[in-house]
Design a protein with these regions (language model features):
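Amphipathic alpha-helical linker/stalk segments
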Residues: 27-69
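Amphipathic alpha-helical segments that line or abut small-molecule/effector binding pockets
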Residues: 56-79, 84, 88, 92, ...
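Amphipathic alpha-helical packing segments from all-alpha helical-bundle domains
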Residues: 64, 78-124
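Hydrophobic recognition helices of helix-based DNA-binding modules
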Residues: 8, 26-29, 33, 37, ...
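Hydrophobic/aromatic residues within well-ordered alpha-helical segments
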Residues: 22, 29, 33, 37, ...
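N-terminal hydrophobic signal/anchor transmembrane helix of membrane proteins
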Residues: 45-47, 162-171
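Hydrophobic/aromatic-rich alpha-helical bundle segments in the mid-to-C-terminal region
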Residues: 102-106, 110, 119-166
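Helix-turn-helix
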Residues: 1-32
Length: 171
């Protein structure tokens, strides 16, 4: 709560006057993440819903569009202060409660891997699940590498290179 208050340039007391509880603050953070995720998807004309709900949206995504979206998501999850802090918080908190583990899986592991698999299926990429796991594993690895790197631009360049290499294997 102190860190959040500091980021907002207010005291903890002022923060609690705006929100009823820590839970209320957390719910607002998750709501903001959902909103920002949707905005990212919309900006790159990517599906926001599950494939079962909007299969036609998945059919229109090209591999090149997906790669550009993936690059933007890497920047978002590493360079956007809010998203990066949320990612790091979930990484730490996933071991403290089932709810946090579920959110970690939804935002950073099973959710994205499933999304990539559905996109690859729609692109008629063979072995879509296996290739989706490999693709997303690279993204997830580079999130962690980026966090600890002194030369963050170099890590970003390495990520782009790794993604390009994977894409060549997909074609």
């Amino acid at each position: 709560v102190s860190q959040i208050a500091g980021e907002l340039d207010m005291t903890k007391g002022a923060l609690y006057r705006h929100y009823k509880s820590k839970r209320d603050i957390f719910d607002c953070i998750v709501q903001r993440m959902e909103q920002q995720d949707g905005e990212q998807a919309t900006e790159y004309d990517m599906p926001q819903e599950d494939k079962e709900k909007t299969p036609e949206k998945y059919e229109t995504v090209s591999l090149d569009d997906f790669v550009e979206y993936s690059k933007s998501m890497f920047e978002y999850w590493t360079e956007d202060d809010f998203a990066s802090s949320f990612r790091k918080m979930l990484t730490i908190e996933q071991f403290r409660s089932e709810e946090m583990q579920n959110l970690y899986q939804q935002y950073l592991v099973a959710g994205p891997a499933s999304y990539v698999k559905d996109l690859f299926d729609s692109m008629k990429i063979t072995n879509a699940k296996n290739k989706a796991v490999r693709f997303y594993a690279v993204m997830h690895f580079y999130y962690s590498l980026y966090d600890g790197a002194e030369d963050k631009e170099n890590v970003k360049d390495e990520f782009v290179s790794a993604i390009k290499s994977l894409v060549q294997e997909l074609k």
